[in-house]
């Protein structure tokens, strides 16, 4: 590291609380903190002072420009950079930045997805400063986290609905806590997203069109060794990878990102970074930044960072575990069971709300993790199934069972494990194991939503989760606020809701085929693909939910459905076209060149009176497979040409049912040819080349 003092390094490029205290007048600082804490509007005078202080600080860090940094419906971040310079009368420039420029920007909104909310010619859009997420300096620019909306006020981004959902759950959770005699002004959800990724050599990446255009390999035969030896997970870091991770930590720490854990993952070349949890909107910004920084740092080390959910067939893909909890402004974690969870009525009530939310809004949670990339993982024995269920562990299960049955609860779970060696002390045994096949698992004092794909913006999953739980808390508060006997009413409510929603709790193996049958018996949803999931965005119960909590309007929900269907279709179209190009321009010419060499060898042997049986046999196999590849590629082109163009939903189902099958048909002979054609002829690096030489 260039700086070894980590506390000094951490947040050094962030306009954080420490900097604000140093650079803002006391009254301005207090007003800004009130805005950040309570979500109140910021007045123009305060904004002007903050803007000047922010500009001066940014210049001291080497910034010459500023940008309103936002997250449109593409799921990635967007930025337009303006310099601080303002011309003076004498032909020079001054460095200026006004309160108005801080609070509001005006990017062109016509080139971002709107899902029908805006016509192409309706270009005006606005960005609005989010003061709850710190500004920072990166690459010579001051980055100001913002929300993004249209000229008519319709939301066009990921951040605004997230902030609204956080307000919704705060409002309803505070109502519940008031019933328990607690004076809480604000409740926030917190998230710690674990980020998986692949690192491959940049030279290999540059030689593969599929990786460049789609982020994943469309062809590739399995090498002799994959991940079956279990020797990569938590294995020793190779020097190049360790150097990358060290550099990554430093860059993330500068930006105030709490990078905590790093290790090798299951697949070759696969790794993970996990941060300490923080407030959800900040965690979302930080995760977007993390993915950007990963790509940048990877280039410096001669790598390319792959964030696609399934870059390589035959080995695990990458996900992103969303560790979610709820905390009060007094620091209390509402999902902390305490020493005696059976006696912690408040915790059990919040747990019940989450169980009810996950059951009633399984469709929204499934939608929030749906994508073309994640379709390769969900239900593929490497990630949770596409069926949403919950795992709460043995102790909590026993507590809920006793509440439902009315039987007395007996605590048998607090034990210690004796490891059988005198030098090793007895260690406390957790009251629950970890079920890695569960999409939504309780892990001690938080829920781990494990179905997210590695490339996804975590905002959507947390919007769904926050809003669904807010609705259940609202219903609970409405019922309990009028209760004459609060304790009896709480107990009756919990008992009723557990009985009604226990179907969502599953403790078994989610990879087992029997779970699909069992889930169907329970009436759980099974959306096998993104194409199946997205249309349920606009189910009436979901429209009602978001309208009730002021998270989305009906038009905004419809726009998100259309945007995601359109994105799904575009991704699969690009993949199909890339596959066709690679067959036509690379694989087929390579096979023909190899055939020509084989034919020359066969003819030379014949002329010399030597039998060329092996060469002739190989020539026949390669020729036959090349013909098959050519025919299947032509069929793929025909399938793509027939995609419906009048309806995104129809097109999505067509891509899933027809085009993907046609792509599989193309890949099969190509992968066989890779194992037959001489290495010097094969036109791009193979899995063996890519996965084992970093």
Model-derived features: positions:
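Short, compositionally biased "basic patch" segments
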Residues: 1-7
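Active-site core of metal-dependent hydrolases
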Residues: 9-122
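Active-site proximal loops enriched in glycine and acidic residues that flank catalytic Cys/His/Asp
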Residues: 46, 70, 98, 275, ...
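Active-site-proximal loop/turn and secondary-structure-junction residues that shape catalytic pockets
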Residues: 46-50, 70-72, 100-101, 148, ...
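Hydrophobic/aromatic-rich, well-ordered segments within soluble, folded domains that form packed cores
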Residues: 63, 67-71, 284-300, 326, ...
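Short linear, low-complexity motifs centered on an aromatic residue
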Residues: 75-90, 110, 208, 215-217, ...
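Glycine-rich, acidic/polar active-site loops that bind/position phosphate-bearing ligands
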Residues: 123-307, 316-319, 326-562
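C-terminal amphipathic alpha-helical interaction region
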Residues: 499-694
């Amino acid at each position: 590291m260039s700086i070894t003092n980590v506390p000094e390094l951490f947040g050094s490029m962030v306009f954080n609380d420490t900097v604000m205290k140093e650079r803002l007048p006391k009254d301005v600082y207090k007003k800004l903190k009130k805005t950040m804490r309570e979500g109140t509007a910021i007045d123009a005078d305060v904004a002007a002072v903050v803007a000047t202080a922010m500009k001066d600080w940014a210049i001291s860090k080497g910034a010459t420009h500023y940008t309103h940094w936002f997250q449109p419906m593409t799921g990635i971040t967007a930025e337009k950079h303006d310099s601080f310079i303002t011309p003076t009368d004498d032909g020079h420039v001054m460095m200026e930045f006004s309160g108005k420029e801080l609070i509001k920007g005006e990017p062109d909104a016509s080139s971002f997805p709107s899902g029908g909310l805006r016509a192409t010619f309706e270009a005006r859009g606005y960005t609005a400063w989010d003061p709850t997420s710190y500004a920072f300096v990166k690459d010579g620019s001051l980055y100001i986290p913002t929300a993004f909306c249209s000229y008519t006020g319709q939301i066009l981004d990921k951040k605004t609905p997230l902030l609204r959902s956080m307000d919704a759950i705060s409002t309803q959770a505070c109502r519940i806590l008031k019933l328990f005699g607690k004076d809480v002004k604000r409740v926030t959800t917190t998230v710690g997203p674990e980020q998986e990724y692949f690192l491959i050599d940049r030279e290999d990446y540059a030689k593969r069109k599929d990786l460049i255009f789609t982020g994943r390999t469309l062809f590739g035969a399995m090498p002799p060794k994959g991940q079956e030896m279990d020797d990569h997970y938590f294995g020793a870091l190779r020097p190049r990878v360790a150097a990358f991770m060290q550099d990554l930590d430093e860059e993330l720490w500068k930006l105030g990102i709490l990078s905590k854990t790093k290790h090798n993952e299951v697949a070759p070349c696969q790794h993970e970074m996990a941060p300490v949890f923080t407030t959800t909107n900040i965690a979302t910004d930080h995760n977007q930044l993390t993915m950007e920084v990963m790509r940048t740092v990877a280039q410096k080390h001669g790598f390319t960072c792959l964030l696609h959910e399934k870059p390589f067939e035959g080995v695990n893909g990458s996900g992103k575990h969303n560790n979610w909890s709820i905390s009060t402004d007094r620091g209390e974690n509402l999902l902390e069971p305490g020493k005696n969870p059976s006696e912690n009525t408040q915790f059990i009530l919040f747990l019940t709300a989450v169980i009810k939310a996950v059951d009633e809004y399984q469709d929204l949670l499934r939608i929030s993790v749906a994508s073309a990339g994640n379709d390769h993982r969900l239900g593929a024995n490497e990630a949770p199934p596409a069926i949403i269920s919950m795992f709460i562990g043995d102790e909590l299960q026993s507590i809920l069972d006793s509440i439902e049955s009315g039987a007395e609860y007996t605590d048998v779970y607090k034990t210690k494990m004796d490891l059988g060696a005198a030098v090793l002390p007895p260690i406390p045994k957790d009251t629950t194991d970890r079920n890695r096949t569960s999409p939504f698992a309780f892990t001690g004092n938080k829920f781990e939503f494990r179905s997210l794909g590695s490339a996804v913006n975590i905002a959507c999953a947390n919007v769904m989760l926050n809003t669904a739980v807010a609705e259940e808390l609202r219903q609970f508060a409405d019922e309990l606020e009028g209760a004459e006997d609060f304790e009896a009413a709480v107990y009756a409510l919990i008992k009723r809701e557990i009985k009604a929603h226990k179907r969502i709790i599953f403790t078994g193996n989610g990879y087992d085929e029997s779970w699909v049958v069992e889930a169907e018996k329970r009436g759980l949803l099974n959306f096998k693909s993104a194409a199946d999931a997205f249309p349920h965005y606009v189910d009436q119960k979901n429209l009602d939910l978001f309208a009730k909590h002021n998270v989305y309007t009906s038009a905004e929900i419809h726009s998100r459905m259309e945007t995601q269907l359109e994105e799904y279709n575009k991704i699969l179209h690009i993949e199909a076209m890339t596959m066709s190009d690679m067959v036509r321009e690379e694989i087929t010419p390579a096979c023909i060149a190899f055939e020509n060499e084989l034919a020359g060898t066969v003819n030379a042997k014949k002329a010399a009176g030597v039998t060329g049986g092996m060469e002739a046999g190989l020539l026949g196999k390669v020729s036959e497979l090349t013909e098959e590849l050519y025919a299947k590629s032509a069929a793929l082109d025909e399938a793509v040409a027939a995609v419906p163009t009048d309806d995104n939903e129809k097109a999505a189902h067509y891509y899933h049912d027809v085009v993907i099958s046609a792509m599989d048909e193309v890949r099969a002979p190509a992968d066989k040819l890779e194992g037959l054609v001489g290495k010097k002829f094969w036109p791009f690096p193979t899995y063996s080349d890519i996965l084992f030489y970093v």
